[in-house]
């Protein structure tokens, strides 16, 4: 079995939590890491820890996304792993939602994913090699009250990933969508005392991403659901 080998990873929507865990894991595997976010000041410590480079980018702006890939190529190289970890939310009672805020939330979760994935695919297809990974959520498969914009964006993102997987997988590009069905533990967000183990460990999630990246072509996963063992579903 031939295990895919990767050299450069780009994580879009980078911040603390899962993005940081992915950056650390990729760096430990000898993969060079690029981090993209609207505000990169928050990424300084992670860059120093992992040797990653940070790039400012609004993922909903087509020109900025194209420039992002150009800068990453010039400064690091062409990414053969691209993770889309950005999402937008606009919470509220359905009849009170502000249309402009809803449009922005959907743009971040779905349209930004399209823009980033399109630039990634253009560069991966000539080599018939690469992986494009999308971070989904419980809202990717079920809508919750007062969370319609998040559900719309995540449902659309999942549809994008599924369509891409069916089109690009036969051309050598591994497209995978991860349904993160539960809250992710962080320094600012921990399990309540009466519900131990009720949140996902970001390092454990990152390991699942890595396991998917290591799959031989004869047995690729397109979608994976991850949740704590105590989570009801």
Describe each PLM feature range.
Residues 117-118, 162:
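A short, exposed helix-loop element centered on a Lys and neighboring polar residues
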Residues 15-16:
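Conserved glycine-rich cofactor-binding loop
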Residues 49-63:
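Rossmann-fold cofactor-recognition segment
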Residues 88, 95-114, 133, 157:
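Catalytic Tyr-X3-Lys loop
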Residues 6-7, 78-79, 93, 124-137, ...:
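Active-site loop of short-chain dehydrogenase/reductase
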Residues 131-156, 162, 166-169, 184:
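Catalytic loop of short-chain dehydrogenase/reductase
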Residues 29-45:
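Conserved glycine-rich Rossmann-like NAD(P)H-binding loop of the short-chain dehydrogenase/reductase
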Residues 170-185, 191-233:
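C-terminal helical subdomain
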